[in-house]
Amino acid sequence: VKEFSEIKDSMHIDWDVPIKMDDGLELRADIFRPIKEGVYPVLITYGPYAKGLPFQQGYPSAWDRMAEKHPDVTRGSSNKYQNWEVVDPEKWVPDGYVCVRVDSRGCGASPGYIDHFSMRETMDFKECIEWAGVQLWSNGNVGINGVSYFGINQWQVASQQPSHLKAMCIWEGASDWYRDMTHHGGILSTFWANWFDMQVKTVQHGLGKNGMINQFNGRPICGNDELSEEQLEVNRCSFGDEIRAHPLNNQYHEERSAVWDKITVPFLSAGNWGGQGLHLRGNTEGFIRAASEQKWLEIHGLEHWTEFYTDYGVNLQKRFFDHFLKGIKNDWLDQPKVQLQVRHIDGFKKRHETEWPIERTTWTKMYMNDAYEMSGEIKNTDSSSITFDAMGDGIDFKSRPFDEETEITGPMALKLFVSSSTEDADLFVVLRLFSDQDNEVVFQGAVDPYTPIAQGWLRASHRKLDQQLSRPWRPYHSHTEKAVLNPGEIVEMDIEIWPTSIVIPKGYYLMLSIQGKDYECPDAQPQKLSNFKNQLKGCGPFLHNDPIDRDARFNGQTSLHFGESRAPYLLLPIIPKQ
């Protein structure tokens, strides 16, 4: 790969700049900076999606949907330099920022072995940050701003405390490799194996002209080298197999997760109510647990990538970075610590809070009974049970219609008393909203257009709690050992349900579905995005259908138990009207 520079579209662009790592390997970066000589703050990203692959070329269905619905995304830019889940330099360089995009080891223009989220990747990223901080065009203040992968690795690299890292914006970025990303409640997510096939192998370094060619400049996206399929395979991990080989939370997961007491840099953590199954939990946990004294939380809706690129998102990001990277005395320090786009059935309303979870929350228990109801009272005084197929559709508990508009915003928890005919059981928990006409109300999630209001998961053998980290509103499971069931034995299970926000109209009601498999919206009309294998039916690509992980042990009968001493309940965060 040859480095060269040009002045184009009102920017000085340095293509394929080498950055040498401590082991001698050279990563490649594209650098977009102001034409006027000077020193500027730097926004850097490091990731696998190929810096030379235009957003609209690599992800056409996501791009077309976003561009059509949100014209402010494309306005004011040629869009030739748009790249998946990182900033558009044409919207940042004119405001005095340098934008640096680094292809991670083994991807795009960078050679090497692909090992996602490993300590090697994290240390590469740290070295790139320190490199950017001392370049002639840098003022020494480096920030990170990106979505998803480019958010996840912010938590990781900040845990290593690079000296030039002065601020970061984690836009929809998970933080716990086990709990957020690979094993929901101990149940294997098949997302990463499919993601690896669709979004990484397609841009692996060494594809050369056999790979994609940038539609705007005609350059090979994956470098000039052309390796055989055997050589390509040697140069990458077997990602899905590696994840499956680590079913418990151990060093493999811990080195790919945030170290909260080491994260001290100012940050803005931006989550998505529809980010069930990947990112939302990481954004809220980061805000609660990171050691940083200057930290803010924002939660929005719509697709995973949309608000990052809209005027709403870009303006928020610029206010934050202008203060911390440029030293501008703007109004950022007056920004309330929490900014929520509170979700209604027909849109969102912005509201500020001072903390998360919201301090004025009325934590409300809704008890389930054997009449398939949810209410504020314990109705079962005698022992009883309901049994369902352990991999089936499960059972539904219905609340009474709400007699007034009611807001639920925050994390949730579910207590159950469970037995199985086998040694284990997987529980999939779905909180759903229905209209006064008995029609289910679903939302555009981070990926899926049929997303319910909240979900949670737990494998019975993973029910052990970390007592130090658990809270009534967020059970925290250790996942370091298995406690298998004796068939017929009744055990207590506390299930974490990821945060949500919904203002429930008068006359609408909630339904709690407890299932043995992933949720599917009954009214879903099959849809796909170009970068995912599966149809979108309610859970997006975040499925739990691996036949090795969910073998015959999970295919028996599951029973829920009721009684005065076994009163299952859903803990709801009801927000009083102000």
Predicted regions and their residues:
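Accessory cap/linker subdomain of secreted extracellular hydrolases
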Residues: 52-56, 60-78, 82-89, 94, ...
